[in-house]
Amino acid sequence: LGDVYKRQVQPQMREVPRNMGIGSGVIITEDGYIITNNHVIDRSDKVMVTLNDKREFEAKVIGTDPDTDIALLKIDANGLQPIEYGNSDDVVLGEWVLAVGNPYNLTSTVTAGIISAKARQLGGKMNLESFLQTDAAVNPGNSGGALVNAKGELIGINTAIQSPTGSYSGYSFAVPVNVARKVVSDLKEYGKVQRAMIGIKMQELTPALAKEYKLKEQSGIYVAEVIPGGAAEKAGVKVGDVILQLNGYEAKTFAQLQEQLAQYTPGNTVQMTLSLSLIHI
C-alpha cells in the first residue's frame, strides 16, 4: 500500500478565498483534467488548484452535475501523472481501499479501510444515490479526493460522511468511479449529463409486496407501470415483471438500478434480466 501512496497522491485542490473552504481532487489526464465534488466548488468565484509539488493553477470549471455531486475542472498544465481507473462494479465487500485527500488542510493524507457496503443510499441528499461505503477515515477537506483499491486504481470519489458532529465517525461514502467516468465524459462532450431512462414506474420489492402480488421473487424492482413509447415498452417489458439484473450486474434495489443506468447514455443498448409476470404467458 505504501507504493500505491507514492504513485497516486497527485492532486490537491483548494478553493479561493481560502477561508471559504478547501477540498481535494483527482488528476485524470496528462493535460490537466481533474475530478472533484460539485459541493466543493459550488458558488465559488475562483477555484485554485495546488499540486503535490506546490505548483498552483487557476482552474476552469468545465461542468458540474449536482445530481451525482461531480464536477470537472481543467488547469493549463501538461505532463501530469493521471490516476489509473478501476472498475467499481467489480468491487467486493471486505476489499481494502485507501482514501486520499486534504482533511483539515493536512495535505496528502492517506487513510485505509475496507468496503463495507455497495449501492448505499443516504436518504435522498442527492438525486442519484448509490455510494460505496467504507470505514476509511474521511473528514472535511477529503471531499473530491480519490478512493483507490490496493492496486492504486481509482474506484470512487470521496463525497460524504455519516456523522452527527460533521467529523468522521466510522462511515464514509464515495461516488462509484464508473458513474463518475460517465459524468465526466458527458460534461466534456455535451456540457451536461445525458441521463438514460428505461421508461417504467417501479417499486422496490419486499417480501410483503411479493406476497401481496403473488410473486416468486422476494427482491427486485417491480414494474408497476410501463410508459407508452419508452424503451421498456419497445423491449416487451410488462407490468408485473421484476427486474433482477442490468448487463449482468445485480439491480434489485433502486440504488443498484440507478448506479447501472447512470453509466449509460440515451441510445445505448443494455441487457436486462427479468422475472416475467404471468402476463407474458
Could you say what each language-model-derived stretch is?
Residues 2-229, 233-235, 249, 254-269, ...:
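Serine-dependent protease modules
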Residues 240:
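Conserved catalytic motifs of ABC-family nucleotide-binding domains
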